[in-house]
Amino acid sequence: MEDEKAILALAALAQPTRLQAFRTLVKHEPGGMAAGDLARALEVPQNTLSAHLTVLSRAELVTSERHSRSIVYRANLGVFQKVALFLLQDCCGGDPEICAPLIESLQPRCPPNRKERNHV
């Protein structure tokens, strides 16, 4: 991942509503959430949320797809994974004794029966 893309993604998440929106979308994977439902869940006006989702979309952290009369947003876990790996690529000078606990703590906590979908 290039520095510029990582900076764009991290900057997009460096705002409370956008961070909360992204985390909510992660919780609703793999199905995503309709924009109106997400606005109600976050208790923000739809037009305000739309602006925030645009920022997250530009950073490629969320994707959107029209479903009938709704737009469904999903967290782009593939890009998020690239950002996390970018931040950790030189972790602890490569010392496995130091890195292992950190990497282990980053393992997904999803229920085992839930299908994981990684979309880019």
Predicted regions mapped to residue ranges:
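Amphipathic alpha-helical dimerization/coiled-coil segments
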Residues: 1-5, 26-27, 77-120
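Alpha-helical residues within the helix-turn-helix
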Residues: 40, 57-58
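Residues within the DNA-recognition helix of helix-turn-helix
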Residues: 52
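Beta-hairpin "wing" of winged helix-turn-helix
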Residues: 58-67, 74
